[in-house]
Amino acid sequence: MADEHTLAHLFRAQPQAVGRSPNEAWSPQRFRLSPAPLARILDEGDMIETGDRSFHVIHLPGHSPGSIGLLDERNGDLLAGDAIYRGRLIDDLPGSDALAYRQTMQRLLQIEFSRAFCGHGETIDQIELRAIARTYLDSAG
């Protein structure tokens, strides 16, 4: 995958982005990720069945275009990805959309769940997620 389709170039420019090399021959300049083959494009409301779990696809754009979350209503789990996490929510990356991010925060205030697995940091509960969303909406508004 070409760097222009990722943010890899930003991480290569930050020596602290990788704490230590996985082996002596590893080089961040030569590192490449091979994309998994596309099986299908997911859309709002689609279901993903894993055998023992079912996830509803929820469109959560703003941080990055096309971001999704996965909601397991039976277990109360929300896989939120980079849509929300502790700390300053980033809405100024290439491809970010602050207006769409505000709509995502509004949406997250309405979703019922027990715990959210975020793309960064620890698992959070619904109360903390809603506090983060409200803080973003208050500061961005």
Where are these regions (language model features)?
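Generic beta-sheet signal
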Residues: 1-3, 80-81, 119
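Active-site HxH/HxHxD metal-binding segment of metal-dependent hydrolases
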Residues: 1-47, 138
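General structural signal for secondary-structure boundaries
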Residues: 3, 35, 94, 112, ...
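Short, glycine/charged-enriched secondary-structure capping and boundary segments
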Residues: 5-8, 75-76, 93-95, 130-133
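Short glycine/proline- and charge-enriched loop/turn segments
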Residues: 23-26, 84-87, 132-140
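Catalytic core of the metallo-beta-lactamase
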Residues: 28-104, 110
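Divalent-metal (often Zn2+) His-rich catalytic cores of metallo-beta-lactamase-fold enzymes
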Residues: 71, 77, 100-141
